[in-house]
Amino acid sequence: MRALRILLILVIVFGGLFVAADRGAVYFAEGQVADRIKSSQGLTSDPKVSIKGFPFLTQVLDSSLEEIDISLDGVSASADGHDVQVTEVKAELKDVKINSSFSSATAARATGSAHISYANLAKSAPPGSTIAYAGPERAAEGQVKLSGPLADVLEGAGVDVPQPVKALLGDRDVSLYSTVSIENGNTVRLRAKTLPTLPIPGLTDQIRDVVDYDLKLDGIPSSIKLDQVTATQDGLRFAGAGTNVSLAG
């Protein structure tokens, strides 16, 4: 019995040492992967990397990791010099083939997602305007609502509005719905669905020039191509998927 107890103690001790060594190796590898991704993808912030699966060391010996989860902070988007915060930037990578130094990594499958709140999205809109949820029916068509005092919106975008025109416009508000799409995996495009009819010739075209614009997403790994956008009650949610996604090297 004493020998059995000693054997059990040794099993527990060595098992604990193995787990500790395995977790230590994971921690080191996560740092290596984060550094490789940051440098190869040109990111401005340090990604948070979580390598899934146990034991890790046997995965390394097989040169294949079950799953790597990546999250990013400090990601922004820009439009005409206006910066917009992008949150909840995440990527989930499956069946990742690696080499011994982690200098190359390729995921058989990958999914990515990101979020922009309406409050943040409004920072890219013409000054004086707001962007909000357009309601369930229009949201289902990928639309958002843009509104604001017409004269303020035009002037906020740098359009010269003469005093006689201001007097004619009075307190008139502009309220329209823009369709949101995503192009090339990193460009958010807003295009007005319809424009109000105004009593001043040429003003409608000027409004379109103001409210139609592109928002470039910066800091998202170039290998993750977002191709879906959904308008929800709390903002825009983006998603994308890919195969044979290269992460480093």
Across the structure, where does each feature detected by a protein language model lie?
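Short, exposed beta-strand/loop patches in secreted or surface proteins that constitute
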Residues: 129-137, 179-181, 227-229
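N-terminal beta-strand/beta-hairpin edge segment
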Residues: 44-122, 126-155, 159-163
